[in-house]
Amino acid sequence: HTKASHANSTLATDGERLIAFFGSEGLYAYDLKGKLLWQKDLGVLDAGWFTDPSAQWETGSSPILHDNVVVIQADVQKGSFLAAFDARTGKELWRVSRSDVPTWGTPTVHQVNGQTQLVVNGWRHIGAYDFKTGKEIWKLTGGGDIPVPTPVVHDGLIFITSAHGPKAPVYAIRETATGDITLADGATSNAGVAWSAARDGGYMCTPPVYRGLVYIVKYNGVLSVYDAKTGEVKFQQRLAGGTSAFTSSPIAADGKVFLASEDGRVYVLKAGPTFEVLAENDMTESVLST
């Protein structure tokens, strides 16, 4: 892919070691002076687009590191899996199969009533897993067919979005969900899903949740802001006049939300339920990273 490389994944560190994931080239651990501690060959991880396997986009999911455990989400053409490794030795602790095509999201670690969970995005297989064993806790089908954004947790809800193909959903999932929580046709909520929106999902950007609002920006620059608890739409506004794509995820701090377009324009908005631009800054170069 023209926007990809052989090093799409972000490094993970716990202050003692660096974990790097290079898809088919393997999983690596280094100390902070660059000494190789261990490496794992995970085989061929074919992350080509499922409708055109010859389109080699490379893997994009980043490793996560928690409590001396490294977790990898490897959704590929054949044999998709989620796996955990001992960060000190590289020993595989568990591996579970996933019924999904290539996806590019990174898992999130979350504590629910004393249980550590892994939450993953997907198309056919969005879900949560027990961090210690890999046992599935809940699952959900019905994402966009090229999932990229990372799940975000806020105030008892897990926000998952994706966009591409016929669906572009936003889900607010209760952290206590169990079992199959896939929505029935025409439904927007159930016992596991607090609320959802069918067509406002983000393609590339992970949405921040800030001061009770969810900020979801589409690839074409349309920003949708939701009440995190109720799903009420506060406003929708197009940024960049529709002339630039958005790949970089928004960030929020100090009462402001920062959104960077691919053409290098950074939009600074006042955080809140109404649209107000505080500043625009030109980086004079393309911006795709967060």
Positions of PLM-derived features:
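Noncatalytic, solvent-exposed loop/strand surfaces
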Residues: H1-T290
